[in-house]
A protein has these predicted regions:
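Sec/Tat signal peptide C-region and signal peptidase I cleavage site
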Residues: 19-23
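Bacterial N-terminal signal peptides that target proteins for export
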Residues: 1-8
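Bacterial N-terminal signal peptides
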Residues: 9-16
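Lectin-like carbohydrate-binding module/patch detector with strong preference for beta-trefoil
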Residues: 24-192
Length: 192
């Protein structure tokens, strides 16, 4: 009886350790990343003018395809530190857009689900949807049950050749509001 008890204790400890190791962040806050559709190795998620996210040819000179990945309580925010923009799930139009980083916008949070062939990107606030890359290169949010069976829902996240710019940690920071009696001021700090 004592041997079974010890065996179960050791087994429980091993399972607990494995969960803790696997739950640790795998994205370095001081690096930039490119997000590739799994079947298209020379195109990455980026944006031009406006708010639509498009596939662009990989280029280290294009800052609008470089993403810093911030972990926030098990979810992730993809932030372009050069323009302080984040990927956002527009669930009403089932589209992927970029908007200014907003710490209270849950539509900017993503679940990154690992598979053997890549990752799947699921909006954290709408887990019934999943990001897919259509054959024509359009990116859209689709019903998760349908998308999970499609290769179009697989993406690769790779470290970019572009280094993180100095001071970018401050640019990616959410806006801070300070209370001054009945007034609120944005970034009420010296030099702002």
């Amino acid at each position: 009886m004592m041997k079974i008890y010890r065996f179960l204790m050791v087994l429980g400890l091993l399972v607990w350790m494995a969960q803790n190791v696997s739950s640790q962040s795998r994205y370095d806050k001081d690096k930039l990343y490119n997000v590739f559709p799994a079947k298209v190795s020379n195109k990455v998620l980026g944006y031009d003018k406006g708010s639509s996210v498009i596939l662009k040819s990989l280029s280290k000179d294009d800052q609008k395809q470089q993403w810093n990945i911030n972990e926030l309580s098990g979810s992730f925010r993809f932030v372009n530190v050069f323009e302080d923009k984040a990927l956002r799930a527009d669930v009403d139009h089932k589209a992927l857009v970029v908007t200014e980083v907003n710490g209270s916008d849950e539509a900017q949070l993503w679940s990154i689900q690992e598979t053997t062939n890549g990752v799947r990107l699921v909006p954290a606030n709408t887990p019934s949807l999943m990001l897919v890359c259509q054959k024509d290169g359009r990116l859209q949010l689709m019903d998760r049950k349908k998308a999970e069976a499609m290769e179009a829902s697989l993406f690769q996240i790779r470290v970019s050749a572009v280094p993180m710019p100095e001071g970018a940690g401050m640019a990616a920071r959410e806006k801070v509001y300070w209370e001054d009696e009945t007034r609120f001021e944005e970034n009420k700090e010296v030099g702002h």
